[in-house]
Amino acid sequence: MIGLLLGLIYYIPALVANGSAPFIKSGTPIDFKRKLNDGRRVLGDGKTFEGLLLSLTFGTTVGAIISRFLGIEWIIIGFVESLGAMLGDMLGAFIKRRIGLERGARAPILDQLDFILGATVVLISFNVNLNIYQVVFVCVLVIALHMFTNYVAYRLKIKSVPW
C-alpha cells in the first residue's frame, strides 16, 4: 500500500500541471492556428502558451514542495515531468484533431491518460523506480479523478463541457 501511495506522490506534479491549464481561458495557441494538409488545426485553441506556462509553474512549484518532504531533488523532475505531462496532453489533442474530433469532444481514455503517458515517459527516463502496480493504480485513480474534477470544473464554469 505504501508503494502505491509513493507512486501517486511521484505523479503529483503532472496532476497539478494538467489540472491548472484550464484556468487560462484564452491566449496564444501553441500551433499559431496552423492547419495540416488534412485542413484541421494541429492542436486547436485549447493549447496555449499561457496555459503551458501556468502548468509548468504550478507543477514545478509542487515538485519543489515534494523535494522538501522526500529529501530528493524534485524541482527539476517536477518541471520536466510537468512538461512531459503537457506534451502528452498535446499529443492527445493532436490525435483528436487527426481523427476529426473538435475541442471539447469526448475521447474516453485518451482524455484521461494522455498526460499520464507523457509524465510516465519522463519519470522512467529519470530512473524513478516505478512498477506496473503503481502506474496502473495512478491510471485508475486518474480516470476517477478526471470524471469528478471535470464535472466540478464544468459546474464552476471553468470548462464548457463536463468531460
From Swiss-Prot:
Cofactors needed by this protein, per the record, are: Mg(2+)
Keywords from the named record: Cell membrane, Lipid biosynthesis, Lipid metabolism, Magnesium, Membrane, Phospholipid biosynthesis, Phospholipid metabolism, Transferase, Transmembrane, Transmembrane helix
* Membrane-protein topology: Multi-pass membrane protein
Q: Does the keyword Zinc-finger apply?
A: no
Please state the protein's primary subcellular location. membrane
Q: Which domain of life is it from?
A: Archaea
Q: Which is a GO BP term held by this UniProt record?
A: glycerophospholipid biosynthetic process
Which Gene Ontology cellular component terms are annotated? plasma membrane
Q: What is its EC number?
A: 2.7.7.67
- Residue ranges crossing the lipid bilayer per the database entry: 4-24, 52-72, 75-95, 107-127, 128-148
Gene Ontology MF annotations: CDP-2,3-bis-(O-geranylgeranyl)-sn-glycerol synthase activity
Q: Which family does it belong to?
A: Belongs to the CDP-archaeol synthase family.
Q: Know the name of this protein? A: CDP-archaeol synthase
Name of the gene encoding the protein in the UniProt record = carS
